[in-house]
């Protein structure tokens, strides 16, 4: 793949086996990698934008987000064939001015007021203090895929807004 590549457009690399992306790549558009990126989780050093469903990861693994990332679309990453207990999520560089992650790999706005991604650990899902808004489709609660599962308790849902 050329080192001068700065953007991958919709379906641009779908079906291509990709082991790494050039560090100067700045933008991954919607569905840009398709199934080609299932086994590599490190994002290019200078990447700025991740579009909707731009990455599909087979089974598990955390996506590394560098300090240069300015925008992550809702549902930018899809973990396929994952189940309760699989490790997934994000590891955001501390120097990133827009996003942060916690020890679980959950994704938040830098100020911690918006939760974009989280997955169920055990039988209860606890929304951390300080979170004011939660992206509803970013909660992986397992019982019936992405929706709130039977018997799953969301602790703190009465004090946040879902969008």
Segments the model singles out, each with a brief description of its role:
Residues 1-163:
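Solvent-exposed loop and capping/linker segments of extracellular ligand-binding repeat ectodomains
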């Amino acid at each position: 793949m050329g080192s001068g590549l700065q953007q991958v457009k919709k379906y641009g690399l779908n079906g291509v086996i990709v082991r790494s992306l050039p560090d100067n790549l700045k933008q991954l558009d919607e569905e840009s990698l398709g199934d080609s990126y299932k086994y590599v989780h490190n994002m290019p050093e200078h990447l700025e934008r991740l579009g909707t469903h731009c990455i599909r990861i087979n089974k598990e693994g955390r996506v590394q987000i560098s300090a240069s990332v300015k925008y992550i679309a809702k549902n930018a990453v899809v973990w396929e064939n994952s189940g309760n207990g699989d490790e997934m999520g994000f590891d955001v560089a501390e120097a990133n001015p827009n996003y942060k992650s916690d020890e679980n790999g959950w994704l938040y706005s830098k100020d911690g007021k918006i939760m974009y991604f989280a997955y169920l650990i055990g039988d209860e899902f606890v929304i951390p203090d300080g979170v004011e808004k939660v992206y509803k489709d970013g909660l992986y609660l397992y019982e019936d895929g992405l929706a709130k599962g039977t018997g799953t308790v969301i602790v703190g849902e009465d004090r946040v807004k879902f969008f």
